[in-house]
A protein has these predicted regions:
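Non-transmembrane, aqueous-exposed alpha-helical and coiled segments at domain scale
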Residues: 1-182
Length: 182
């Protein structure tokens, strides 16, 4: 609920739904509007309490099944990657570091995913090269993606740029910058 009450996150979510997800769906305009309103109302519902850790369970497979199809459809239709839904992948990558503001975060996922992230983050030094290696490693994990996402035009660069921005500028500043796109 807090996500739609925060003006920055609300703008991000609204733009993601209306500009990146809805245009990839094959429904009537009435059905699309209903879909958008229902998603936003679900987020606003004070009786539905989702905690970040519950939502984050198995995030990589959720991204693959729920978000990646829209990313690919958007790319096919617009010949460019969507900003917000690709940013979501970068945010997951940073989340799977397992730490925030110096505090440990317990991530929950299939063991192979947790092992992959642990291995890729363990020697991370914060350099642009390290960020690129990290992103390439995640995107190349075919067991999760059923293919190598590095082969998608501009995917590696865009995710790398977002991971770098999150790490160097912070999540909120990065989301604000994305909101200013378009």
């Amino acid at each position: 609920r807090e996500s739609v009450e925060d003006p920055i996150l609300n703008e991000f979510l609204t733009k993601a739904i209306y500009e990146e997800i809805i245009p990839t769906l094959s429904l009537s305009s009435e059905e699309l509007e209903t879909f958008a309103k229902e998603v936003i109302e679900r987020f606003k519902n004070p009786f539905i309490k989702h905690y970040l850790m519950s939502i984050s369970l198995n995030s990589m497979s959720k991204y693959k099944t729920r978000v990646l199809p829209s990313v690919l459809a958007y790319l096919d239709k617009n010949k460019q990657l969507p900003e917000r839904t690709v940013f979501a992948l970068a945010a997951y990558i940073v989340f799977y570091r397992g730490a925030y503001n110096g505090e440990k975060i317990e991530t929950k996922d299939n063991q192979d995913i947790l092992d992959l992230y642990a291995d890729l983050w363990k020697d991370f030094d914060g350099s642009k090269e390290a960020i690129t290696r990290l992103v390439e490693g995640i995107l190349a994990y075919e067991s999760n993606w059923d293919g190598d996402l590095n082969t998608i035009p501009n995917m590696t660069k865009q995710v790398t740029d977002y991971v770098e921005a999150i790490l160097n500028e912070g999540m909120e500043a990065t989301i604000k910058a994305i909101n200013e796109v378009k």
